[in-house]
A protein has these predicted regions:
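C-terminal membrane-associated helical module and adjoining short loops/tails
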Residues: 4, 143-310
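Short, glycine- and charge-enriched coil/turn segments that flank and shape catalytic ligand pockets
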Residues: 27-31, 105, 159-164
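Alpha-helical transmembrane segments of multipass membrane proteins
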Residues: 20-24, 93-98, 122-126, 149-153, ...
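Topogenic membrane-insertion module of multi-pass membrane proteins
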Residues: 1-68, 75-89, 100, 113-123, ...
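Transmembrane helix interruption/hinge and helix-loop junction motifs
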Residues: 29, 101, 109-110, 282-289
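Multi-pass membrane catalytic core of lipid/isoprenoid biosynthesis enzymes
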Residues: 40-41, 59-117, 121-124, 142, ...
Length: 310
Protein backbone atom coordinates (compact mmCIF):
# COMPACT_ATOMS: atom_id res chain seq x y z
CA UNK A 1 0.00 0.00 0.00
CA UNK A 2 2.82 2.42 0.85
CA UNK A 3 4.56 1.79 -2.47
CA UNK A 4 1.27 2.28 -4.32
CA UNK A 5 0.91 5.64 -2.59
CA UNK A 6 4.52 6.56 -3.33
CA UNK A 7 4.20 5.95 -7.09
CA UNK A 8 0.71 7.49 -7.19
CA UNK A 9 -0.68 4.29 -8.64
CA UNK A 10 -3.79 5.70 -10.38
CA UNK A 11 -1.63 7.90 -12.60
CA UNK A 12 0.29 5.03 -14.16
CA UNK A 13 -2.70 4.24 -16.37
CA UNK A 14 -2.33 7.65 -18.03
CA UNK A 15 1.19 6.60 -19.05
CA UNK A 16 -0.02 3.20 -20.22
CA UNK A 17 -2.58 5.10 -22.27
CA UNK A 18 -0.39 7.68 -23.97
CA UNK A 19 2.61 5.40 -24.65
CA UNK A 20 0.29 2.70 -26.03
CA UNK A 21 -1.71 5.20 -28.07
CA UNK A 22 1.45 6.61 -29.64
CA UNK A 23 2.58 3.15 -30.73
CA UNK A 24 -0.89 2.23 -32.00
CA UNK A 25 -1.11 5.47 -33.94
CA UNK A 26 2.30 5.06 -35.56
CA UNK A 27 2.09 1.32 -36.21
CA UNK A 28 -1.70 1.08 -36.84
CA UNK A 29 -1.76 -1.83 -34.39
CA UNK A 30 0.40 -3.68 -31.88
CA UNK A 31 2.78 -5.29 -34.36
CA UNK A 32 5.49 -6.09 -33.54
CA UNK A 33 4.04 -7.11 -30.18
CA UNK A 34 7.45 -7.53 -28.53
CA UNK A 35 8.35 -3.91 -29.25
CA UNK A 36 4.91 -2.71 -28.16
CA UNK A 37 5.05 -4.45 -24.78
CA UNK A 38 8.67 -3.50 -24.10
CA UNK A 39 8.25 0.19 -24.92
CA UNK A 40 5.14 0.39 -22.72
CA UNK A 41 7.07 -1.21 -19.84
CA UNK A 42 9.85 1.33 -20.42
CA UNK A 43 7.34 4.16 -20.10
CA UNK A 44 5.94 2.74 -16.86
CA UNK A 45 9.41 2.25 -15.36
CA UNK A 46 10.43 5.82 -16.17
CA UNK A 47 7.17 7.21 -14.79
CA UNK A 48 7.47 5.29 -11.53
CA UNK A 49 11.10 6.38 -11.26
CA UNK A 50 9.95 9.99 -11.54
CA UNK A 51 7.30 9.56 -8.87
CA UNK A 52 9.69 7.91 -6.41
CA UNK A 53 12.55 10.34 -7.00
CA UNK A 54 10.09 13.20 -6.58
CA UNK A 55 9.55 12.16 -2.97
CA UNK A 56 13.24 11.36 -2.47
CA UNK A 57 14.21 14.91 -3.45
CA UNK A 58 11.32 16.34 -1.37
CA UNK A 59 11.88 14.30 1.80
CA UNK A 60 12.91 17.24 4.01
CA UNK A 61 10.00 19.39 2.85
CA UNK A 62 7.59 16.47 3.24
CA UNK A 63 8.75 15.91 6.82
CA UNK A 64 7.49 19.41 7.58
CA UNK A 65 4.43 19.80 5.35
CA UNK A 66 3.37 16.26 4.33
CA UNK A 67 4.44 13.94 7.15
CA UNK A 68 1.88 11.35 6.06
CA UNK A 69 3.77 10.57 2.82
CA UNK A 70 5.34 7.08 2.87
CA UNK A 71 8.99 8.18 3.30
CA UNK A 72 8.63 10.75 6.14
CA UNK A 73 6.06 8.48 7.81
CA UNK A 74 8.70 5.73 8.00
CA UNK A 75 6.72 3.29 5.85
CA UNK A 76 9.49 3.22 3.24
CA UNK A 77 13.15 3.85 4.07
CA UNK A 78 14.79 6.68 2.15
CA UNK A 79 17.57 4.30 1.08
CA UNK A 80 15.08 1.83 -0.36
CA UNK A 81 13.32 4.62 -2.22
CA UNK A 82 16.60 5.86 -3.70
CA UNK A 83 17.54 2.39 -4.94
CA UNK A 84 14.07 1.84 -6.40
CA UNK A 85 13.92 5.26 -8.06
CA UNK A 86 17.35 5.20 -9.68
CA UNK A 87 16.99 1.50 -10.50
CA UNK A 88 13.70 2.07 -12.31
CA UNK A 89 15.22 5.02 -14.17
CA UNK A 90 18.04 2.83 -15.48
CA UNK A 91 15.60 0.01 -16.21
CA UNK A 92 13.38 2.35 -18.21
CA UNK A 93 16.25 3.52 -20.41
CA UNK A 94 17.44 -0.07 -20.76
CA UNK A 95 14.01 -1.34 -21.80
CA UNK A 96 13.66 1.50 -24.31
CA UNK A 97 17.01 0.52 -25.82
CA UNK A 98 15.98 -3.13 -26.03
CA UNK A 99 12.64 -2.22 -27.63
CA UNK A 100 14.39 -0.70 -30.62
CA UNK A 101 16.40 -3.86 -31.26
CA UNK A 102 13.76 -6.56 -30.93
CA UNK A 103 12.83 -8.49 -34.10
CA UNK A 104 10.22 -6.62 -36.15
CA UNK A 105 9.89 -8.44 -39.45
CA UNK A 106 11.39 -6.32 -42.21
CA UNK A 107 11.63 -3.23 -40.01
CA UNK A 108 15.21 -2.23 -39.14
CA UNK A 109 16.51 -1.87 -35.61
CA UNK A 110 16.48 1.65 -34.22
CA UNK A 111 18.31 3.59 -31.54
CA UNK A 112 15.53 6.18 -31.42
CA UNK A 113 13.77 4.65 -28.35
CA UNK A 114 17.10 4.67 -26.49
CA UNK A 115 17.67 8.34 -27.32
CA UNK A 116 14.14 9.37 -26.33
CA UNK A 117 14.26 7.25 -23.16
CA UNK A 118 17.57 8.79 -22.10
CA UNK A 119 16.31 12.32 -22.77
CA UNK A 120 13.13 11.58 -20.81
CA UNK A 121 15.19 10.30 -17.87
CA UNK A 122 17.25 13.51 -17.88
CA UNK A 123 14.14 15.72 -17.91
CA UNK A 124 12.57 13.64 -15.10
CA UNK A 125 15.60 14.17 -12.86
CA UNK A 126 15.75 17.86 -13.80
CA UNK A 127 12.11 18.32 -12.80
CA UNK A 128 12.36 16.34 -9.57
CA UNK A 129 15.57 18.13 -8.59
CA UNK A 130 16.49 21.71 -9.54
CA UNK A 131 13.45 22.80 -11.57
CA UNK A 132 10.51 21.85 -9.37
CA UNK A 133 10.52 25.03 -7.29
CA UNK A 134 11.09 27.33 -10.28
CA UNK A 135 8.74 28.85 -12.89
CA UNK A 136 10.13 26.26 -15.33
CA UNK A 137 8.50 23.40 -13.43
CA UNK A 138 5.32 23.26 -15.58
CA UNK A 139 7.46 23.38 -18.73
CA UNK A 140 9.55 20.46 -17.48
CA UNK A 141 6.43 18.49 -16.56
CA UNK A 142 4.98 19.15 -19.99
CA UNK A 143 8.29 18.10 -21.52
CA UNK A 144 8.05 14.77 -19.73
CA UNK A 145 4.64 14.15 -21.29
CA UNK A 146 5.92 15.16 -24.75
CA UNK A 147 8.75 12.65 -24.46
CA UNK A 148 6.44 9.98 -23.00
CA UNK A 149 4.28 10.11 -26.13
CA UNK A 150 7.31 10.19 -28.43
CA UNK A 151 8.73 7.20 -26.54
CA UNK A 152 5.70 5.15 -27.53
CA UNK A 153 6.04 6.13 -31.19
CA UNK A 154 9.84 5.84 -31.28
CA UNK A 155 9.86 2.04 -31.55
CA UNK A 156 8.18 2.37 -34.96
CA UNK A 157 10.69 4.71 -36.62
CA UNK A 158 14.31 4.10 -37.65
CA UNK A 159 16.89 6.87 -37.61
CA UNK A 160 17.56 7.86 -41.23
CA UNK A 161 20.18 10.48 -42.07
CA UNK A 162 18.63 13.61 -43.52
CA UNK A 163 15.08 12.59 -42.55
CA UNK A 164 12.96 13.91 -39.64
CA UNK A 165 13.01 11.59 -36.65
CA UNK A 166 9.19 11.69 -36.41
CA UNK A 167 6.38 12.74 -38.78
CA UNK A 168 5.23 16.31 -38.15
CA UNK A 169 1.77 15.26 -36.97
CA UNK A 170 3.23 12.88 -34.35
CA UNK A 171 5.44 15.67 -32.98
CA UNK A 172 2.48 18.05 -32.88
CA UNK A 173 0.36 15.52 -30.98
CA UNK A 174 3.18 15.03 -28.48
CA UNK A 175 3.50 18.80 -28.08
CA UNK A 176 -0.27 19.02 -27.64
CA UNK A 177 -0.14 16.56 -24.74
CA UNK A 178 2.80 18.47 -23.30
CA UNK A 179 1.06 21.85 -23.50
CA UNK A 180 -2.13 20.35 -22.02
CA UNK A 181 -0.19 18.91 -19.06
CA UNK A 182 1.79 22.14 -18.70
CA UNK A 183 -1.52 23.96 -18.29
CA UNK A 184 -2.82 21.49 -15.71
CA UNK A 185 0.48 21.73 -13.81
CA UNK A 186 0.34 25.53 -13.85
CA UNK A 187 -3.16 25.48 -12.34
CA UNK A 188 -1.91 23.08 -9.67
CA UNK A 189 0.88 25.37 -8.43
CA UNK A 190 -1.17 26.52 -5.41
CA UNK A 191 -3.79 23.78 -5.19
CA UNK A 192 -3.32 23.25 -1.44
CA UNK A 193 -3.75 26.93 -0.53
CA UNK A 194 -6.39 28.06 -3.02
CA UNK A 195 -7.21 31.71 -3.53
CA UNK A 196 -6.99 33.93 -6.62
CA UNK A 197 -3.84 33.41 -8.66
CA UNK A 198 -2.68 34.34 -12.16
CA UNK A 199 -1.54 30.72 -12.44
CA UNK A 200 -5.18 29.64 -12.65
CA UNK A 201 -5.94 31.97 -15.56
CA UNK A 202 -2.70 31.14 -17.36
CA UNK A 203 -3.08 27.41 -16.75
CA UNK A 204 -6.62 27.39 -18.11
CA UNK A 205 -5.55 29.18 -21.30
CA UNK A 206 -2.58 26.84 -21.79
CA UNK A 207 -4.76 23.77 -21.20
CA UNK A 208 -7.21 25.02 -23.83
CA UNK A 209 -4.33 25.62 -26.25
CA UNK A 210 -3.07 22.07 -25.72
CA UNK A 211 -6.55 20.71 -26.40
CA UNK A 212 -6.75 22.66 -29.67
CA UNK A 213 -3.34 21.33 -30.74
CA UNK A 214 -4.50 17.77 -30.08
CA UNK A 215 -7.68 18.35 -32.08
CA UNK A 216 -5.98 19.64 -35.24
CA UNK A 217 -2.64 17.76 -35.21
CA UNK A 218 -3.79 14.74 -37.28
CA UNK A 219 -4.60 17.08 -40.17
CA UNK A 220 -0.84 17.50 -40.63
CA UNK A 221 -0.45 13.86 -41.64
CA UNK A 222 0.46 13.22 -45.27
CA UNK A 223 -1.21 9.80 -45.15
CA UNK A 224 -4.67 10.40 -43.72
CA UNK A 225 -6.09 7.46 -45.66
CA UNK A 226 -4.76 5.18 -42.92
CA UNK A 227 -6.85 6.89 -40.24
CA UNK A 228 -10.02 5.24 -38.95
CA UNK A 229 -11.66 8.57 -38.03
CA UNK A 230 -11.93 11.70 -40.16
CA UNK A 231 -9.23 14.11 -38.89
CA UNK A 232 -11.07 17.16 -40.25
CA UNK A 233 -14.46 16.96 -38.56
CA UNK A 234 -15.21 13.90 -36.40
CA UNK A 235 -11.86 13.79 -34.63
CA UNK A 236 -11.73 17.48 -33.59
CA UNK A 237 -15.29 17.11 -32.29
CA UNK A 238 -14.24 14.07 -30.22
CA UNK A 239 -11.32 15.92 -28.65
CA UNK A 240 -13.50 18.96 -27.99
CA UNK A 241 -16.12 16.91 -26.16
CA UNK A 242 -13.45 15.17 -24.08
CA UNK A 243 -11.62 18.37 -23.13
CA UNK A 244 -14.73 20.49 -22.50
CA UNK A 245 -15.48 19.19 -18.96
CA UNK A 246 -11.90 19.96 -17.91
CA UNK A 247 -12.13 23.50 -19.27
CA UNK A 248 -15.52 24.06 -17.63
CA UNK A 249 -14.14 22.92 -14.26
CA UNK A 250 -11.08 25.10 -14.80
CA UNK A 251 -13.29 28.11 -15.47
CA UNK A 252 -15.22 27.32 -12.29
CA UNK A 253 -11.96 27.16 -10.32
CA UNK A 254 -10.93 30.56 -11.70
CA UNK A 255 -14.23 32.08 -10.54
CA UNK A 256 -14.19 30.32 -7.15
CA UNK A 257 -10.57 29.33 -6.40
CA UNK A 258 -11.16 27.10 -3.40
CA UNK A 259 -8.64 24.29 -2.82
CA UNK A 260 -11.37 21.70 -3.42
CA UNK A 261 -12.36 23.13 -6.80
CA UNK A 262 -8.76 23.50 -7.93
CA UNK A 263 -7.85 19.97 -6.81
CA UNK A 264 -10.94 18.54 -8.51
CA UNK A 265 -10.00 20.31 -11.73
CA UNK A 266 -6.46 18.91 -11.54
CA UNK A 267 -7.72 15.41 -10.80
CA UNK A 268 -10.18 15.46 -13.70
CA UNK A 269 -7.56 17.02 -15.97
CA UNK A 270 -5.05 14.27 -15.27
CA UNK A 271 -7.58 11.46 -15.66
CA UNK A 272 -8.79 12.97 -18.94
CA UNK A 273 -5.42 12.09 -20.49
CA UNK A 274 -6.78 8.55 -20.87
CA UNK A 275 -9.79 9.33 -23.12
CA UNK A 276 -7.62 11.80 -25.05
CA UNK A 277 -5.07 9.05 -25.66
CA UNK A 278 -7.87 6.61 -26.52
CA UNK A 279 -8.96 8.96 -29.30
CA UNK A 280 -5.54 8.68 -30.93
CA UNK A 281 -5.54 4.91 -30.52
CA UNK A 282 -8.90 4.80 -32.32
CA UNK A 283 -7.60 7.17 -34.99
CA UNK A 284 -4.60 5.00 -35.82
CA UNK A 285 -5.68 1.45 -35.00
CA UNK A 286 -9.48 1.48 -35.01
CA UNK A 287 -12.34 1.67 -32.50
CA UNK A 288 -11.53 -1.62 -30.77
CA UNK A 289 -8.16 -0.33 -29.62
CA UNK A 290 -9.71 3.02 -28.79
CA UNK A 291 -12.17 1.32 -26.45
CA UNK A 292 -9.40 -0.83 -24.95
CA UNK A 293 -7.36 2.25 -24.06
CA UNK A 294 -10.45 4.09 -22.82
CA UNK A 295 -11.20 1.22 -20.41
CA UNK A 296 -7.97 2.04 -18.58
CA UNK A 297 -10.06 4.81 -17.03
CA UNK A 298 -11.93 2.21 -14.95
CA UNK A 299 -9.03 1.15 -12.67
CA UNK A 300 -7.78 4.74 -12.70
CA UNK A 301 -11.03 6.14 -11.32
CA UNK A 302 -11.37 3.32 -8.78
CA UNK A 303 -7.82 3.73 -7.49
CA UNK A 304 -8.06 7.53 -7.48
CA UNK A 305 -10.70 7.20 -4.78
CA UNK A 306 -8.06 5.55 -2.56
CA UNK A 307 -4.84 7.30 -3.58
CA UNK A 308 -3.97 10.89 -4.40
CA UNK A 309 -3.23 11.62 -8.06
CA UNK A 310 -1.37 14.91 -7.40
Amino acid sequence: MAWAQLVRLPNVFTVLADVSAAFLLASHGTQPVSRFVTIVLAGVALYWAGMILNDVFDVERDQQYRPGRPIPAGQIAIGQARIAGWGLLLAGVGLATVAGHLPAGDAPTTWLPAAVGLLLAIVIVAYDGPLKKTPLAPVAMGGCRVLSFLLGASACFPIIAGEPLFPKYVVTIALGFGVYVMGITTMARHEDKGGPSPNLHLGLVVTALGSIMLAVAPQMSTNQAGFHVSPRDVFPFMIGMIALPVLIRGFGAVRDPSPLKIQTTIRVGILTIIPLAASFAALGAGPTWGIAIFLLAVPTIYLSLRFRVT
